[in-house]
């Protein structure tokens, strides 16, 4: 828990938004590749 407290409050929402965004983008590109093929 000390590790979570040492991070700034911005770190959690940043990861919460960036990680899903990257996952959605990679999934979108994967589906687009399959459509082209």
From Swiss-Prot:
Cellular component, GO, one term: chloroplast thylakoid membrane
Principal place of residence: plastid
Domain of life assignment: Eukaryota
Membrane topology designation: Single-pass membrane protein
Keyword vocabulary terms for this entry: Chloroplast, Membrane, Photosynthesis, Photosystem I, Plastid, Thylakoid, Transmembrane, Transmembrane helix
UniProt cross-references to SUPFAM superfamilies, sorted A to Z: Subunit VIII of photosystem I reaction centre, PsaI
Pfam family, one: PSI_8
Membrane-crossing residue ranges in chain numbering: 10-30
Compartment list: Plastid, Chloroplast thylakoid membrane
GO biological process: photosynthesis
Function: May help in the organization of the PsaL subunit.
Family under the similarity heading: Belongs to the PsaI family.
Protein name, UniProt field: Photosystem I reaction center subunit VIII
Organism: Citrus sinensis
Taxonomic classification: Eukaryota, Viridiplantae, Streptophyta, Embryophyta, Tracheophyta
Gene assigned in the entry: psaI
């Amino acid at each position: 828990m000390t590790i979570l407290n040492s991070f700034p409050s911005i770190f959690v929402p940043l990861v919460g938004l960036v990680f899903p965004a990257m996952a959605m983008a990679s999934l979108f590109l994967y589906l687009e590749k399959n459509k082209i093929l």
